[in-house]
Design a protein with these regions (language model features):
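N-terminal Rossmann NAD(P)H-binding glycine-rich loop of SDR-like oxidoreductase domains
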Residues: 1-22
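Residues at the starts of beta-strands that form the adenosine-phosphate
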Residues: 2, 27-28, 103-104
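SDR active-site strand-loop-helix element
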Residues: 6, 32, 66-70, 105-111
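Ser/Thr-centric signal marking residues that sit
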Residues: 6-9, 85, 90
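Short loop/turn motifs at secondary-structure junctions
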Residues: 25, 62, 101-102
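Conserved glycine-rich Rossmann-like NAD(P)H-binding loop of the short-chain dehydrogenase/reductase
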Residues: 25-34
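NAD(P)H-binding glycine-rich loop region in Rossmannoid oxidoreductase-like domains
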Residues: 38, 44, 48-85, 96, ...
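Conserved Rossmann-fold NAD(P)-dependent oxidoreductase catalytic core, especially the SDR/UDP-sugar
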Residues: 88, 92-118
Length: 118
């Protein structure tokens, strides 16, 4: 099984990559992040992309599963950036996965999904 993980360099993403590296059912993992981390893991190759603006189709083509973990959680710092990543980014991930024919998509989100604000 080929898995693509968006937001792969975050806390949840790196924990998931470590688990996937030890899963015999997983043949390869693409860790997608805005910046490539130093972390090296078995079965994992890194790719850089911003889910809210970059082309995702090439990264998703041939994937069996996309796990979407790219989100921002601090609305007080930059609400527009949080909206762009959390809303626009998720819309783009869903569209790209559908267009690439990905069979399964797992989506987790942040507290930002509950519309935090003043």
């Amino acid at each position: 099984m080929r898995v693509v993980v968006t937001g792969a360099s975050g806390n949840v993403g790196t924990s998931l990559l470590k688990a996937l590296a030890g899963d015999p059912a997983v043949s390869s993992v693409v860790g997608l992040a805005r910046r490539r981390p130093e972390l090296e893991l078995a079965k994992t190759t890194w790719a850089t992309a911003d889910v809210a603006g970059d082309d995702l189709g090439g990264h998703f083509r041939g994937a069996d599963v996309v796990v979407h973990l790219a989100w921002l959680i601090q609305p007080s710092h930059d609400p527009f950036a949080m909206w762009r990543t959390n809303v626009v980014g998720t819309e783009r991930v869903l569209a790209a996965a559908a267009q690439a024919g990905v069979g399964a998509l797992v989506c987790a989100s942040s507290v930002g999904a509950y519309s935090p604000g003043p």
